[in-house]
């Protein structure tokens, strides 16, 4: 009902202002655009400043909504800059980690005192995607304490893993909490190596002998790439948590590609099956596709640019 209200033009002023600063059209807004364009602007307030700024924007009257949305947009741009810088630093360390015995590396812990506390969770998710192992990213919160944010992989309950570490090494964890896929922990700075080693040890108990290669599940080949089919799939179905949008895969030819300022890759692709040129966006991809064709995994979306709707592939993997 909420997205129908937005599409009918009856959204609150703050929501309309957020849609405007994101460069979107409220009349054809999709759940994916809410997740990837609107929500990050709201979340940026809590990550870098005060989460109440997001609430105030949502409740804002007409006369102040645009200004508050612009404040959130500026915070989100700063968050993206910080995230990109931290990501480059963290990913530079991964080749060294990969050089260690793969058989003995079941988790990854990284620490840098310069990393922003509000962005370490996002960074943990990015590193996890690169190494296919549970990851904790730490930063310094004062002279003696480190705060860490973790992200896990399917089949390994991260909070339960911390419970085992805490039971084995009483006093190591100052505090911790979370759930299966994400957790937070505070430790003494002097205990970083001990935590790293114990986490790896207990993760190994559960993961030893199991393939750590990421499993990518697809619904198969799309029936078509035409606008009517894609728009019906995107706009007329209640995709969300517990009911995810379908994921497709297909080998496509790479015609053009361009790295965008935000650390994303925009592509022009050709489907030999339909002899159709397609637009694609690969979020958080900071390097080109090296081959002239590749096997892509993607979701379908509708991209509106200057009032014209076009089908778009939102790429998640290049195999």
Predicted feature residues:
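Mid-to-C-terminal polyanion-binding domains and interfaces
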Residues: 65-70, 74-110, 143, 156, ...
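Hydrophobic helix-and-loop "lid/oligomerization" segment in the mid-to-C-terminal part
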Residues: 1-191, 222-224
């Amino acid at each position: 009902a909420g997205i129908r209200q937005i599409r009918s033009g009856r959204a609150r002023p703050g929501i309309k202002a957020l849609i405007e600063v994101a460069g979107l059209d409220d009349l054809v807004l999709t759940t994916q655009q809410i997740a990837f364009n609107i929500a990050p602007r709201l979340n940026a307030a809590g990550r870098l400043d005060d989460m109440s700024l997001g609430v105030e924007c949502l409740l804002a009257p007409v006369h102040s909504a645009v200004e508050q949305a612009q404040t959130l947009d500026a915070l989100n741009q700063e968050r993206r800059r910080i995230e990109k810088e931290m990501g480059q630093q963290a990913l530079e360390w991964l080749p060294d980690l990969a050089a260690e015995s793969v058989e003995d590396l079941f988790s990854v812990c990284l620490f840098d005192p310069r990393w922003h506390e509000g962005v370490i969770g996002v960074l943990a998710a990015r590193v996890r995607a690169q190494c296919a192992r549970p990851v904790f990213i730490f930063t310094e919160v004062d002279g003696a304490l480190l705060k860490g944010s973790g992200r896990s992989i399917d089949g390994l309950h991260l909070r339960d893993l911390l419970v085992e570490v805490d039971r084995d090494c009483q006093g190591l964890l100052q505090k911790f909490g979370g759930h299966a896929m994400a957790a937070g922990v505070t430790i003494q700075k002097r205990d970083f190596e001990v935590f790293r080693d114990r986490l790896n040890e207990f993760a190994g108990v559960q993961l030893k002998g199991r393939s750590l290669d990421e499993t990518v599940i697809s619904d198969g080949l799309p029936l078509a790439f035409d606008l009517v089919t894609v728009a019906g799939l995107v706009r007329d179905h209640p995709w969300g948590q517990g009911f995810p949008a379908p994921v497709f895969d297909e080998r496509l030819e790479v015609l053009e590609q361009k790295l965008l300022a935000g650390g994303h890759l925009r592509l022009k692709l050709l489907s030999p099956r339909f002899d159709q040129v397609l637009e694609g966006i690969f979020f958080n991809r900071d390097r080109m596709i090296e081959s002239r064709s590749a096997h892509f995994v993607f979701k379908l979306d509708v991209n509106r640019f200057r009032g014209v709707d076009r089908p778009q592939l939102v790429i998640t993997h290049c195999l």
